[in-house]
Amino acid sequence: MSSYQQKQPFTPPPQPQQHQVKQPCQPPPQDTFVPITKDPCHPNVPSPGNTNIAEQGYVKIPEQGSIKVPDTGYTKIPDSGNTKVPESGCTSVPGSGYSVVPQPGYTKVPDQGYTKVPESGCTSVPGSGYSVVPQPGYTKVPESGCTSVPGPGYPTVPQPGYTKVPESGCTSVPGSGYSVIPQPSYTKVPESGCTSVPGPGYPTVPQPGYTKVQEPNPSIVTPGLSQKKTK
């Protein structure tokens, strides 16, 4: 066995370090360079449902039909040439300290102290002790079919310049203790067919300047004379 080992030639193992050191000295191969292309990226095109958060200093122009509701105490200074046309039927509820300048044709509903015009067929029945004191120059024209039934103790004191024009077919039935005190220059002209039935204790005190127009050809029938003629 020893003789066999001595006959084999000794071959040293290859040194890889020396081979690696020699590689930089060799010239690089002359091959065509092919760049590696990646998938196209589109960062500026938002996908559906993407939310874009604007950075500081970004100006966004609102589209047509955008509605902006200012907070309380918010002051908005419109630019020059800015025109806002409200749509028909638009209702604006201003906040505290907000000024509204109505446009031509604007209708404003007045607050307390406005004048109310009663409709036809109105019936006014005042209670006991109810006083109506009209102002100077006040004219009351009752409509057709209006019935006024004053209660007991109802005083009517017309002011100077007060004119009352009763309509045809108006019936006034005063209660007990009803007093009518006309003022100077008060003129009462009864219409045709007007019936006045005074109650018991009804005094009529005409004042100076009071004019009473009687109907033509009044007929007075006493019960005593008619019974004697029939006998």
UniProtKB/Swiss-Prot annotation:
A GO CC annotation given for this chain: cytoplasm
Full protein name: Small proline-rich protein 3
Record-annotated disulphide pairs: none
GO BP annotations listed: keratinization
Bias (Polar residues): 80-94, 214-231
Region entry 21 X 8 AA approximate tandem repeats, spans: 55-222
Stimuli inducing this protein: Suppressed by retinoic acid. RAR-selective retinoid is more effective than RXR-selective retinoid.
Modified residues (N-acetylserine): 2
Renumbered residue ranges of the record's region Disordered: 1-104, 188-231
Ranges occupied by Sequence repeats: 55-62, 63-70, 71-78, 79-86, 87-94, 95-102, 103-110, 111-118, 119-126, 127-134, 135-142, 143-150, 151-158, 159-166, 167-174, 175-182, 183-190, 191-198, 199-206, 207-214, 215-222
Tissues expressing this chain: Suprabasal layers of the squamous epithelia of esophagus, tongue and oral mucosa.
One Pfam family, short name: Cornifin
Keyword hit for Repeat: yes
Signal peptide annotation: none
Sorted UniProt keywords: Acetylation, Cytoplasm, Keratinization, Repeat
The species this protein was found in: Oryctolagus cuniculus (Rabbit)
Protein location: Cytoplasm
Top-level taxonomic group: Eukaryota
Family under the similarity heading: Belongs to the cornifin (SPRR) family.
Function: Can serve as a substrate in transglutaminase-catalyzed cross linking reactions and can function as a cross-linked envelope precursor.
